Swiss-Prot record:
It comes from Dinoroseobacter shibae (strain DSM 16493 / NCIMB 14021 / DFL 12). SMART domains: Ala_racemase_C. Keywords: Isomerase, Pyridoxal phosphate. This is Alanine racemase. The lineage of its organism: Bacteria, Pseudomonadati, Pseudomonadota, Alphaproteobacteria, Rhodobacterales. The active site is at 35 (proton acceptor), 244 (proton acceptor).
């Protein structure tokens, strides 16, 4: 079979959620972020597994994701929408019983004109300048909004993966300034914020990348393995080049394995001539450019070339691969393409 295999350990995702739940203050509810189709790993399977583990609050990016997730989860858990109540979202929010995180006075007006008794939350901007009401806007609508009984007031940290960054303390102070004294549950932290300590936990945490084995949660169990089949092995002599642009040249006689995956499968070209693949725990350098459907790998040092080499495995997680590609683990995970044969272990189907 020429199709690469992406193996996903749902039990590891559940174990990572439990670990982050334990890391949160014991009085804190621990939600789960499953946007972007569960970081590319199937939001329905991930969410059902986490619901069985105890998660009751789920977060998605847009209402359309929430509709799909509701079909997978059923009526029980809450599904919160980070983008809030956008124009055209009313039917989806009502039909799938979604909870929009209101980001502006405009969204607040839209929500209460269309769905005056429907649950909602509030998102505040405490310094990231991305989503949420800024302080002046919040001051103008806070009395009305709080009087309608929001389910949650939240913000998001810009630099939580850098524990010593001054922005963390500044955003924490601003969140306190904007919300101290309210009786509504509050949430500031995703994975990185959980690891910053109890001062950042408030009433609910929202782990995302840590569930899927990514930094900054260094204790995470590995979740994915990507095994790519070897199509062909050829001998090369010193001075011969490999791949488009002749960007890799053999320094000595050796062997090149051609593997069946490429940038059409989400393996970004920036990892060309930089990334490693693995035969067990033996590293094999990517030789030449990533092409649409193929990789070429230097296997000169292997006594025997296996039927497949691993790009993601215990020896190389998403963050190590991301470092080679000059990106972040989030991009590696969410780019994994549809051509892979996906095998799920554990969890809930």
């Amino acid at each position: 079979m020429a199709t690469a295999t992406l193996s996903i350990d749902l039990d590891a995702i559940a174990a990572n959620w439990r670990a982050l739940d334990r890391a949160s203050n014991r009085r804190v509810a621990t939600g789960a972020v499953v946007k972007a189709d569960g970081y590319g790993l199937d939001a329905g399977r991930v969410a059902r597994t986490l619901a069985q583990a105890g998660a009751r609050q789920f977060f998605v990016a847009v209402a359309e994701e929430g509709v799909t997730l509701r079909k997978a989860l059923g009526p029980g858990p809450a599904i919160n929408v980070f983008s809030g109540h956008m124009e055209g979202d009313t039917q989806a929010i009502a039909g799938a019983r979604l909870t929009p995180m209101i980001n502006s006075a405009e969204q607040l007006a839209r929500h209460f004109e269309a769905l005056p008794r429907h649950p909602f939350g509030i998102q505040l901007d405490t310094g990231m300048n991305r989503l949420g009401m800024e302080a002046d806007e919040w001051a103008a609508v806070a009395e009305f909004a709080l009087g309608q009984g929001p389910k949650l007031v939240m913000s998001h940290l810009a630099c939580a993966d850098e524990p010593g960054h001054a922005a963390n303390a500044a955003q924490l102070a601003e969140f306190h300034r904007l919300t101290d004294g309210i009786t509504v549950p509050r949430s500031l932290s995703a994975t990185g914020g959980i690891l910053l300590g109890e001062a950042y936990h408030f009433d609910m945490t929202r782990p995302g990348i840590g569930l899927y084995g990514g930094a900054p949660f260094g204790a995470a169990e590995p979740v994915v393995r990507l095994s790519i089949p070897v199509v062909q092995v050829r001998a090369v002599t010193a001075g011969e080049s490999v791949g488009y642009g002749c960007s890799w040249v053999a320094q000595s006689d050796g062997a090149i394995a051609t593997l069946s995956a490429g940038y059409a499968d989400g393996l970004i070209r920036a990892m060309s001539n930089r990334a490693m693949l693995y035969a067990g725990d033996v590293a094999c350098p990517l030789a030449g450019r990533v092409s649409m459907d193929l990789l070429t790998v230097d296997v000169s040092h292997l006594d025997e070339v296996p039927e497949a080499l691993d790009l993601l495995c215990p020896a190389q997680g998403v963050d190590r691969l991301a470092e080679a590609a000059g990106t972040i683990g989030y991009e590696i995970l969410t780019s994994l393409g549809p051509r892979y044969a996906r095998h799920y272990a554990g969890g809930v189907a």
